[in-house]
């Protein structure tokens, strides 16, 4: 299927590693021009090189999105270089384990900035360009908002906010023809996930026990699979889909 993404300029926050990297590589294969916004230039450039080696195009902007001023600067840099924005994938963040019992005000607020505030700011500053292009927005979110996990209050709250923003923006932006959807992630073996699993007793046994609970194939979702769904939601092939929380999790 041709997703009609050729030459589309798509911002992908946190696009250098993990799920974001998977999304960027799929978009590159589809002929889009993903633009990574991420804090580590070395990681950004490595993913840019991988996309280009596969015959695609890719760009990058270095930004620390926990800084509220960084989102506007990053979006301006994209517009200055490419002249437009056709889509946004909000993906950057991390399950940072700020719980109810072990957390505090400062850590909780810092986690919300790391995991939710820049979702709002990136889209806020991209909106004029998205109006022109009638672009699409995809928010990457986590099952923790719906299931809980324990010991990660801030991350769960941020993902609840991501889900709420998805539906709120879908309503607010209807008049501009801008669609907004979310891809809800459960288990995907990213570098961050690997670091987390290694903190547990008997990590390999724990990993196998987690995989055993996943109904479809008893395996984790791949970053490429998440990228495929994200690309579809950005495409006009999903032209009548908005305000949806799409669970890509093997059941």
Q: What are the residue ranges of the model-derived segments?
A:
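Residue(s) in the substrate-gating loop at a strand-loop-helix junction
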Residues: 142
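Conserved glycine-rich cofactor-binding loop
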Residues: 16-18, 40
């Amino acid at each position: 299927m041709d997703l009609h993404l050729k030459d589309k300029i798509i911002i992908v926050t946190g696009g250098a590693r993990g799920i974001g990297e998977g999304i960027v590589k799929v978009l590159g294969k589809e002929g889009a021009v993903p633009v990574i916004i991420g804090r580590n230039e070395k990681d950004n450039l490595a993913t840019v090189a991988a996309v280009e080696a596969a015959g695609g195009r890719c760009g990058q902007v270095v930004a620390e999105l926990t800084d509220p001023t960084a989102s506007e600067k990053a979006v301006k840099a994209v517009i200055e270089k490419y002249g437009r924005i056709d889509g946004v994938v909000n993906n950057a963040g991390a399950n940072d384990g700020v719980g109810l019992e072990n957390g505090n005000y400062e850590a909780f607020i810092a986690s919300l900035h790391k995991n939710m505030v820049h979702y709002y700011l990136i889209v806020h500053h991209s909106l004029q360009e998205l109006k022109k292009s009638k672009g699409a927005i995809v928010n990457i979110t986590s099952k923790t908002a719906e299931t809980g996990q324990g010991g990660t209050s801030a991350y769960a709250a941020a993902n609840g906010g991501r889900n709420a923003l998805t539906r709120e923006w879908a309503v607010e932006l209807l008049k501009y023809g801008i669609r907004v959807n979310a891809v809800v992630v459960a288990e995907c073996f990213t570098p961050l996930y690997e670091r987390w699993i290694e903190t547990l007793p008997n990590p390999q046994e724990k990993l196998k026990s987690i995989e055993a609970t996943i109904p479809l194939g008893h395996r984790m979702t791949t970053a490429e699979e998440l990228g495929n769904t994200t690309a579809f939601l950005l495409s006009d092939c999903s032209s009548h889909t908005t305000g949806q929380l799409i669970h890509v999790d093997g059941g």
